[in-house]
């Protein structure tokens, strides 16, 4: 049951992943969101754009499944730290925010203790640095903010646009993510 629910919830999340990244970019730019959450969101975007993924050894849609899960962890923390701003963003992007609790429950139900691997990756988001641009600078410095905006939109054009059929096909093989995550838990 937990696998089916996980796939059911993550299918639309991956189909709209590009839209979700734009929503995360709006969080980075929103001064009503606490700085810690904004920096974590900027780090999440840096991770999505420039890393090889949070789940070792997977490619394509499944690689970005890890990224989608990481974004959910960032949103969960934001909900705790900036509930008013979270609610405001939820009104603008309900398709991303409304299923968050269910997605987190499904993630924990399916991945179990493997979630810790993703949590450890997310903890490093505030310290990420790419091409001389740090996550913290992306909320403080207009040049860094513009660079992040451009980098996100370039990634959306070049690599992050998933066809619904591709998502459905690849999520049928979602169990491929379990072993790589389990190997990281054991470390």
Please give the residue ranges for each predicted region.
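Polybasic, low-complexity association/targeting segments
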Residues: 1-19
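A structural signal for well-ordered alpha-helices, especially hydrophobic packing surfaces
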Residues: 25-28, 49-52, 75, 79-82
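Long, hydrophobic, amphipathic alpha-helical segments used as structural scaffolds
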Residues: 32, 59, 79-86, 115, ...
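Membrane-interface alpha-helices
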Residues: 61-92
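Intrinsically disordered, low-complexity, charge-dense segments enriched in Lys/Arg
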Residues: 97-187
